[in-house]
Amino acid sequence: MAVGKNKGLSKGGKKGGKKKVVDPFSRKDWYDVKAPNMFQTRQIGKTLVNRTQGQRIASDYLKGRVFEVSLADLQKDIDPERSFRKFRLIAEDVQDRNVLCNFHGMDLTTDKYRSMVKKWQTLIEAIVEAKTVDGYLLRVFCIGFTSKDQQSQRKTCYAQQSQVRKIRARMTDIITNEVSGADLKQLVNKLALDSIAKDIEKSCQRIYPLHDVYIRKVKVLKKPRFDVSKLLELHGDGGGKTTEAVVSAEGAVIDRPEGYEPPVQEAV
């Protein structure tokens, strides 16, 4: 065994030296996530992405991101009937530091969905595929439960199979007519107000009384070819550049874009 000093470690070689700590957030940028103008809340949050370097474009990594937001947050409403609905928005384009999103689906929260399933009643579900006027192919899931008659002394409220088939056919007809007769913006407004489920519940009362009728889930199966102008129409003024009024030293009002930073002066 050789006795002596290890020159590599004493001089601070490759193995013994300290690694330079680099903050990973120093090469990332924050982008504002914008919802379409069919919702009251336009800015739903911020997202983080690596800064553009060479052929790695930041906007390419932002497109396709899906954001899940509660309807109560989108509509600035504390109504409990809105809090259990979740809307999915997908990033389709990037304008400056704004990520423009479009509708990508809807779902109910797990706790709400499981709380509706109970004993002594019949669960009726319908799955419908329909296309909107502007070319979006959607798969809509509807759910409903039979309701007990107040005058009845029976513990259960089971429906016959013939009644279940009639109710499911009525659900399919109403959903197909509502989806095929509206564009995506009108359909999202109907989903937010839950008007389709209310029409189904009212229409099926003659067959068998129902309660807890909801559009449980909406999936976007196919979209039309991407058009920037249509996306900008959905966002209106909120998707583009936002300006703020600034009063100069002379008293004139100057409109500056959001996030404006004055240039660095070389000499004072």
UniProtKB/Swiss-Prot annotation:
**Highest taxon of the lineage:** Eukaryota
Sample GO molecular function, one term: structural constituent of ribosome
Under the heading InterPro entries, the entry gives:
Ribosomal_eS1 (IPR001593), Ribosomal_eS1_CS (IPR018281), Ribosomal_eS1_euk (IPR027500)
Q: Which UniProt keywords apply?
A: Cytoplasm, Developmental protein, Differentiation, Oogenesis, Ribonucleoprotein, Ribosomal protein
Q: Name one GO cellular component term.
A: cytosolic small ribosomal subunit
Q: What is its main location?
A: cytoplasm
Give the record's GO biological process terms.
oogenesis; translation
Known Pfam families for this protein? Ribosomal_S3Ae (PF01015)
Disordered: annotated segments = 1-21
Give the matching PROSITE patterns: RIBOSOMAL_S3AE
Cellular compartments annotated = Cytoplasm
Q: Which family does it belong to?
A: Belongs to the eukaryotic ribosomal protein eS1 family.
Instruction: Briefly state the protein's biological role.
Output: Essential for oogenesis; required for late follicle cell development.
Q: What is this protein called?
A: Small ribosomal subunit protein eS1
The species this protein belongs to is: Drosophila virilis
